[in-house]
Amino acid sequence: MSAENTPADSPKPSRQALDAWFTPLRFGIGLAIALVVAFPDVVFGSGAFFHQDYGVLGYPVIHHHHHSFWSGDPIPLWNPYSNCGAPFMAQWGTMTLYPFSLFYLLLPLPWSLGVFCLIHLWLGGMGMYRLAHRRVDLRFAATLAGLIFVFNGFTLSCIQWPNYMIALGWLPWVALTVERACERGGRAIAIAAVVATLQMLSGVPEFIFMTWVIVVALQAVAIIEKRDRSFALLAGRRLAATVLLVTGLSAAQLLPFFELLSLSQRHNGFAAEKWAMPWHGVGNFFVPLFHCAKTYTGTFFQWGQSLIATYYLGLGAMTLATIGAFRGRTKETTALAGIAILSVILAMGENGYLYGLIKDLFPRLGFVRYPIKFLMPLVFVTPLLAAHGARWFMNRKPPLAA
């Protein structure tokens, strides 16, 4: 869904010159520099990520894969070092079939895994830049969107899970390419299927499911705006074709996973209520460490929820997103705002009541552990709404001189 500025809504010449400076190349270079500045030890090899699940889950899994790869077993099916032994490739989250895992398999650990995570952060920022620019047609606003998507509490908290970085890194690209596939068909469907398959191989089923909910919602808005029955039918067929292709391309990973799931201890109510956002957690959107406790390692976690260290998005980002929702009123911004509100309510788990109601209607939702993960859609829509807010600021007329 693209947007073009009409002459009446276009920024002033000085603002146009500023906007023209923020090209994709400059944004990409700037984002890369920002990540290097934020994590110099990881980039230059003098340090490594280690906190929480990165050290006790993520790195050991990758180390086993790395060791197996160099021992002549590039696709290990079994991990003898996990408890008394456990399936490896079938666990999905081990990223065994993710093609770009070759980066950390061929290069030395732990440096390669840390840089691998940062590369996917960069990838996600670039994807959000392209997606936002397609909507608001302003490079400066798209730049803000890309930065907000990368540098927020939720995204940075997810660094401890390398497979989460893959899912988040490809998220904007899935939305962008599937949107184009529904509009253009043909080769665009194949491109969307490949991109979505890359995210599918990350092994984060909750994020993948929510990605497709967002994609379908945005496509529904596009169909409503066009008011063209033939386009609706065509877009629906193209979307279905994309989903079928993704399913086929991912079958080598999905079939073993579902067999493992059927034999595992995971059930509809497995840890369903653990780590939901408490009522006071709303304050964390405005104050980074609201109701947080300091651990012995010097990090902070929220009372009642210790999966995500912080989901603070930044007051500036939230202000722009609010302006985008109320000032740039379109069907899409209304839908994005609705997704944001729904995301927060579901993240509260039973505290928000709606989660329990939906789980009663769809018991399979109980397989999703930790309701706090439902904040992912909020992290996706906030940069887009902020881009709409920035567009409103850039296009508004200056006040009359006294």
What do the PLM-derived regions correspond to, one by one?
Residues 1-41, 234-238:
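Start-transfer (signal-anchor) and selected internal transmembrane alpha helices
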Residues 226-237, 310, 320-353, 399-402:
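Membrane-interface helix-loop-helix junctions at transmembrane boundaries of multi-pass membrane enzymes
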